[in-house]
């Protein structure tokens, strides 16, 4: 049995969709709960994660609960609700990307017939097929399986085999974006039939281009030929990275000791409701992004001044990642539709991007979510005018945290910060790479046992075995 939850910004819309869906039911074989609008008579449009949680709980007496959402923060509220639910209930829940009205009606009919959760989702996702056919539009199945447009006589293409050991991660992808942006041509990058625009470093990353993958550039326009030549030269140069046949041999790192210090970045308070105009909020966001881009230029220069070219390339890549027109466009759309603050819109957009990275199955690319979180934090600091200063240490210290941003690690003094020990994190994150380059001991993914450590307790990190020892 599958029950449904409808999540909408508008109470009237949510109830209306629910009313339509119940017309499809001939029995109580599918329960429907509504979580729509917020309890504020003056500003009733919005979503509430607690409401979503309670709605799910009210229909959790089924094998699965399918959550249908309209847009924007409805998805974020649903994801937050999953974190609030008891694990045994959360395990039953699936979130559906289908259109709210047609998808809910199709899901209701399917669930009422006794279909399993996968069939219900399939029917919801294909709910627009009848309308497409009536309007003479191509099937969505065709679009999903072949997202690249058909070649025409003017379009040229060139395929290369990627020889970068870690694929097209942030640094080589940023080199690709920068290089192709200089040509007057319409371009697409294609891998296995899926196309993205080379203007967006984030779209390129989500293609998950790995070592030995074939990547094709399709170009059309006055400078198409020049773009293809530059693309080939980039590939031959491994997109600016040194070609390595095998992973580099890590230098042996001796155990490091110090006093435990729990580190947490400053928390930025994000208000959803805005008292400003949309244009004023857009200006605030652009200014905060500009300030963050200046921060990244400073970090790049700091690394270059220390002869750390690989680290400088990381923050140069961050600059490209942040300066992505699609991110600003998505945030501007939220500002238009939800009349929210710039920080709320930006948080929504970058959290969604961070989650997309976390869902990748390539460990190296997956770890880039930490870079996105770093950029979000830095921008929120500027938007909320929050003062942030790193703690100063006078004796050997081991930093303890759930995770730590790359920009934070670069600003640490390795003379006193001897090691970093995380409950989460990733051994292939840029934070880990920077720590190793600076000679700071690094262990991660230690889980809850990390929090048994007392502040000021003496710790020794064994980097080789990825374990810590408490010395009282």
Swiss-Prot record:
Q: What is its EC number?
A: 2.7.1.121
Q: Where is this region: PTS EI-like, N-terminal part?
A: 264-472
Q: Which domain of life is it from?
A: Bacteria
In the record, biological process GO terms are: carbohydrate phosphorylation; DNA damage response; glycerol catabolic process; phosphoenolpyruvate-dependent sugar phosphotransferase system; pyruvate metabolic process
Regions that span the bilayer: none
HPr domain: from which residue to which, for each copy? 155-242
What this protein catalyses is: dihydroxyacetone + phosphoenolpyruvate = dihydroxyacetone phosphate + pyruvate
On whether Transferase is a keyword of this UniProt record, the answer is yes
Gene Ontology molecular function terms on file: phosphoenolpyruvate-glycerone phosphotransferase activity; protein homodimerization activity
Which residues catalyse the reaction? Answer: 9, 169, 430
Q: Where is the PTS EIIA type-4 domain?
A: 1-135
Question: Mind telling me which GO cellular component terms the entry cites?
Answer: cytosol; membrane; transferase complex
Q: Which NCBIfam families match?
A: dha_pts, PRK11377.1, PTS_HPr_family
The protein here is known as PEP-dependent dihydroxyacetone kinase, phosphoryl donor subunit DhaM
Q: Which organism is it from?
A: Escherichia coli (strain K12)
The gene for this chain is: dhaM
